[in-house]
């Protein structure tokens, strides 16, 4: 009996690149958001803006660890005027830092003052023209809806013109928890209401020939946040809009869960090519947010700002204390930005799973490890010499820099 041989299956070409949504470039000081530029990392100081020295110190701390845009809150005219001193002192004692100011309730006059001193103004459509809730109201007629829309236009127009004429930018920052009453009655407490709220403000800006816009659709629940951003992208695509998106899960909390929650929302969208700037909002010191942002971007291959470590979870085959050795390797090499280094416990899966790494440290037999350059085994050395020999190999290749 002749057995027919099966044809060798053809392996499809898998594209592992994240193809980012095409967006227009929007300037924020010396930084550009969108337009194919790297995803920008930002945060917000928690100092009172009236405390000029404290605010300057807070902005500087964030900027020095990689925060590329820093936001401040401006709840009053006094806070707005303090921004002039903050900006001047930053330039005199440090350097210019791209600044964004948050403006909320009935903020037109404040926003006009703020626009003189910062690079971008963030407004919340649900609060910019504040509507006092009416417990007796059962809805809005078309006329009432339109009248409030006209009031919004009248209030927003001076700010738009000021930003347009200065070449500055605006973030239209919708929050699920602060939709206006008329949007809630008309569209419900839904992603659709969030999208319509943003589109109303975008169209006013476009009618005044102002398109330096960034849009955000934040929510404290990840599924709502994801739905809102995806619907916003769908609507913008239908309308021929290409505004960059600022991603974030608002009020994510603290600790491990706050980081996981933020990552679940932000990384899911980034993996789909959605998002041009990110903030991880934690109930912790703002400085704690920045490493999380860069870790998300590194994990997705969108920005490489640190060493990428590949390490197995350890099992009964592991030939050395994997956790301790990984710590030693990390401490010795963490400054070598751009390298991929693998630490694997045994040769069963080690060489295959670390094939994309620049260097590998693999358990070979009891008391010995093998060092790899890519897929090639270079040498076997005693485990006690492993970390130093790894350093020597990197140095021999000319890829070492002193910390």
Curated annotation (Swiss-Prot):
Disulfide bonds: none annotated. Binds 1 [4Fe-4S] cluster. GO terms for molecular function: 4 iron, 4 sulfur cluster binding; 4-hydroxy-3-methylbut-2-en-1-yl diphosphate synthase activity (ferredoxin); iron ion binding. The keyword Zinc does not apply. Keywords: 4Fe-4S, Iron, Iron-sulfur, Isoprene biosynthesis, Metal-binding, Oxidoreductase. Converts 2C-methyl-D-erythritol 2,4-cyclodiphosphate (ME-2,4cPP) into 1-hydroxy-2-methyl-2-(E)-butenyl 4-diphosphate. It comes from Synechocystis sp. (strain ATCC 27184 / PCC 6803 / Kazusa). It catalyses: (2E)-4-hydroxy-3-methylbut-2-enyl diphosphate + 2 oxidized [2Fe-2S]-[ferredoxin] + H2O = 2-C-methyl-D-erythritol 2,4-cyclic diphosphate + 2 reduced [2Fe-2S]-[ferredoxin] + H(+). The gene is ispG. One of its GO terms (biological process) is terpenoid biosynthetic process. [4Fe-4S] cluster binds at residues 312, 315, 346, 353. Belongs to the IspG family. Its cofactor is [4Fe-4S] cluster. InterPro entries: Dihydropteroate_synth-like_sf (IPR011005), IspG_bac (IPR016425), IspG_bac-typ (IPR004588), NO2/SO3_Rdtase_4Fe4S_sf (IPR045854). The keyword Zinc-finger does not apply. Its EC number is 1.17.7.1. This is 4-hydroxy-3-methylbut-2-en-1-yl diphosphate synthase (ferredoxin). Gene3D superfamilies: Dihydropteroate synthase-like, Sulfite Reductase Hemoprotein, domain 1. Pathway: Isoprenoid biosynthesis; isopentenyl diphosphate biosynthesis via DXP pathway; isopentenyl diphosphate from 1-deoxy-D-xylulose 5-phosphate: step 5/6.
């Amino acid at each position: 009996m002749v057995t027919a041989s099966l044809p060798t299956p053809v392996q499809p070409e898998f594209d592992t690149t994240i193809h980012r949504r095409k967006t227009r470039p929007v300037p924020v000081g010396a930084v550009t958001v969108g337009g194919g530029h790297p995803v920008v990392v930002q945060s917000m100081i928690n100092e009172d803006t009236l405390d000029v020295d404290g605010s300057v110190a807070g902005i500087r701390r964030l900027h020095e660890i990689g925060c590329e845009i820093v936001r401040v809150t401006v709840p009053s005219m006094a806070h707005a005027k303090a921004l002039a001193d903050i900006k001047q002192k930053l330039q005199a004692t440090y350097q210019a830092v791209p600044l964004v100011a948050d403006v909320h309730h009935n903020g037109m006059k404040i926003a006009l003052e703020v626009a003189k001193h910062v690079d971008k103004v963030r407004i919340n459509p649900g609060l910019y023209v504040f509507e006092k809730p009416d417990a007796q109201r059962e809805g809005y007629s078309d006329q009432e809806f339109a009248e409030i829309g006209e009031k919004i236009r009248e209030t927003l127009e001076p700010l738009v013109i000021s930003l347009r004429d200065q070449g500055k930018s605006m973030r239209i920052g919708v929050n699920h928890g602060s939709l206006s009453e008329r949007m809630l009655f008309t569209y419900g407490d839904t992603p659709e209401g969030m999208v319509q709220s943003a589109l109303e403000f975008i169209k006013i800006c476009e009618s005044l020939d102002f398109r330096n816009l960034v849009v955000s659709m934040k929510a404290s629940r990840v599924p709502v946040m994801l739905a809102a951003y995806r619907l916003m992208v769908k609507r913008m695509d239908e309308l021929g809009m290409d505004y960059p998106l600022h991603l974030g899960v608002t009020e994510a909390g603290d600790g491990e869960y706050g980081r996981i929650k933020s990552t679940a929302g932000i990384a899911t969208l980034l993996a789909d090519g959605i998002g041009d700037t990110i903030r991880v909002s934690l109930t912790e010191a703002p400085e704690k947010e920045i490493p999380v942002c860069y870790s998300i971007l590194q994990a997705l291959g969108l920005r490489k700002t640190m060493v990428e470590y590949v390490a197995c979870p350890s099992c009964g085959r592991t030939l050395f204390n994997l956790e301790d050795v990984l710590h030693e390797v990390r401490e010795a090499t963490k400054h070598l930005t751009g390298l991929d280094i693998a630490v694997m416990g045994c040769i069963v899966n080690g060489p295959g799973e670390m094939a994309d790494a620049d260097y590998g440290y693999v358990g070979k037999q009891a008391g010995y490890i093998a060092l790899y350059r890519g897929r090639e085994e270079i040498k076997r050395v005693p485990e006690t010499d492993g970390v130093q020999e790894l350093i020597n190999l990197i140095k021999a290749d000319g890829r070492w820099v002193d910390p």
